[in-house]
Amino acid sequence: MEEYQVYLKLHRSRHQDLLYPLFFRESIYRLAYGHGSFFVENVGYNKKWSLLIVKRLITRMYQQIDLIIFANDSNKNPFGDSNKNFYSLIILEGFVVVVEIRFSLQFWISSLKELEIVKSYNTLRSISSIFPFFEDKLIYLNHESDIRIPYPIHLEILVQILRYWIKDVFFFHFLRLFFYYYFNSTSVFTPKKDISISFSKSNPRFFLFLYNLYVWEYESIFLFLRNKSSQLRFKYFRVFFERIFFYEKIEHLLEISAKDCLYTLSFFKDPFIHYVRYQGKSIFVSKNTPLLIKKWKYYFIYLWQCHFDIWSRSETIYLNQLSQHSFNFLGYFLSIRLNVSVVRSQMLQNSFLIQIFIKKLDTIVRILPLIRLLAKEKFCNILGHPISKPVWVNLSDFDIIDRFLQICRNFSHYYNGSEKKKSLYQIKYILRLSCIKTLARKHKSTVRTFLKRLGSEKLLEEFFTEEDIFSLIFPRTSFTLQRLYRDRIWYLDILFRNDLVNHS
C-alpha cells in the first residue's frame, strides 16, 4: 500500500495557499526570483507580459473596488461593460502568470536538482530523445493505437482539478463567478458549441494552462493504471478516478475483495506498454494481445466519460498492427520494415542459404507537407517553385542571407534523423533559390545577372554541406558511402519545435 501512496501522493509542500498570498502581497517577486531568472518570457506567446507589468496590473486591481465588491449591485454584471471587462482580463492574466510560476518546469527542476535526482535533464527533455527510444523498443512491439485526446471539457471539472493543488476556497468562488459571467455574456452572441472556441481565442494563455492541467490529470491517472494495472472488474474500476480519499478507497476495496468477492484484488506491472503524447494526440504501443489492447481502449473511454464528463466514442482510438501500419509523429513518418539478409552457411561438404529477417524502424520525411509549409510562409508556391520574399527586401544582404541560412539550419538540425535525405535536399534547394531571388529583387536585377556578379558557387557552399553536394552529384555510390551520408543523427538539444517545422 505504501508503494501506491508514493506514486500518487500529492506533494503537500505544493498544495498550499497559493493565489491570495501572491495577489495581495508581494511575495510573488520573492517566489519568482528565488528560483532563478527563468521567468523572462514565454516562447510563442505575446511577450508584452512581464513581471513588472503584472505588478502594475495588481496595483491597478487594488484601485478597482467595484470589481471586488459585487454585493452592492448584485443585479448588474460586473464584467459587462468594456472597461470592467478589461479589468477582468487583467485579473485573468495575473492569475495565469502567477500560477505559471508555480507550475513552471524550471521551478520543479530546481527542486529536483537540489535532491540530485536529475543529472542529465537537458538531454532527456529534448523532443528528439524519443526517437532513439523508438528505435530500441518499437521493433519488439506488436500493436499501436492512435488516441485523439477529447477536448474541451466542462470548466467546472477544471476547477475541481485545481482543488488538488490549491486550498484557496475564495479563489474557487471567484473563478466560478468569472466563468459564469463570461459565459453568460458570451452566449448571447455565440452558440453554445462555439463558446469554448471563442474562449480559447480570446484568452489563449489561460486556455492553454487549463488544457495542460487537464492533460496532466488525465495522464497521472493513466500512468498509475499503466504501472499498476488493475484486475478489477469494470464496475469497480471507476473508484480510482477520484483522487480525493484515494488511499482510503483502496483499503476499503481490499476489505471487500477479501470478504465478499470471489476474486482477489491484485496489481501487476506491465512492462510492454509505452505511451507518448504530442500536441492533441497520443500514441499507445504495446506487445499485448489484441484482447488486452481493446481492454485498454475502453479504459480510456471510461476514464474520459466518468471522470471528466466527456462523451467520447470508440472511433477516437484506432487500433493498428505495427507491421502493417505507418503513422506520423513529430514531422516524421514512422513504419516498421523487414530487412532480409541472406547468409551462406557450409557444413562439411554441404552448403545452404539462410534468410534472416531483421525488423528496422524507418524514419521518412515527406516532402509535400514541407512544401505546403514553405508555401504558407511565402518561400515558394504550392507546386514547390521558389519565389522571392518581398517583406525582407528592405533588410541588408547579410541579414537576408543569415535569415535564410538560419531556417535552413533549423530544418537540417530537426530532420537529420531521416534515413533518406532527398526531401531535406529539396527543401534546401528551395530556400537557396528563394534567397537568391530575394536578393535579386532587392538589387532590381535578374537572377542570372545577380548570380554572375555574386558567383554561382557562393551560396551553394553556404546552404549545402560537402556530403550533401556529393550525394546530389553522385546519387549511386558505394554502399559504404551511402551508409556514411544517410546515417540518422538525433540532436538531443532540441527543446521545442520551430514554427517552420511545425506543420503537422
UniProtKB/Swiss-Prot annotation:
Signal sequence extent: none
MF GO annotations: RNA binding
Keyword Ligase assigned: no
Subcellular location field: Plastid, Chloroplast
Record-linked InterPro entries: Domain_X, Maturase_MatK, Maturase_MatK_N
Keywords noted in UniProt: Chloroplast, mRNA processing, Plastid, RNA-binding, tRNA processing
Coarse class of the protein's main subcellular location: plastid
Superkingdom classification of source: Eukaryota
GO CC terms: chloroplast
UniProt GO BP: mRNA processing; RNA splicing; tRNA processing
Family membership: Belongs to the intron maturase 2 family. MatK subfamily.
Summary of the function given for this chain in its UniProt record: Usually encoded in the trnK tRNA gene intron. Probably assists in splicing its own and other chloroplast group II introns.
PANTHER family: MATURASE K
Protein name: Maturase K
Organism: Erythrina crista-galli (Cockspur coral tree)
Phylogenetic lineage: Eukaryota, Viridiplantae, Streptophyta, Embryophyta, Tracheophyta
Gene, per the UniProt record: matK
